[in-house]
Amino acid sequence: PAPDSSFIRDP
């Protein structure tokens, strides 16, 4: 999985 997905969260 992409590392960016790790920091993505719901606002």
Swiss-Prot record:
GO term, biological process aspect, one: neuropeptide signaling pathway
Keyword check for Ubl conjugation: no
Domain of life where this protein originates: Eukaryota
Role played: FMRFamides and FMRFamide-like peptides are neuropeptides.
Species of origin: Lobatophasma redelinghuysense (Gladiator)
Protein name (Swiss-Prot/TrEMBL): Extended FMRFamide-10
Listed GO CC annotations: extracellular region
Entry coiled-coil feature ranges: none
Family: Belongs to the FARP (FMRF amide related peptide) family.
Keywords recorded for this protein, A-Z: Neuropeptide, Secreted
Keyword Secreted part of the UniProt annotation: yes
Cellular localisation: Secreted
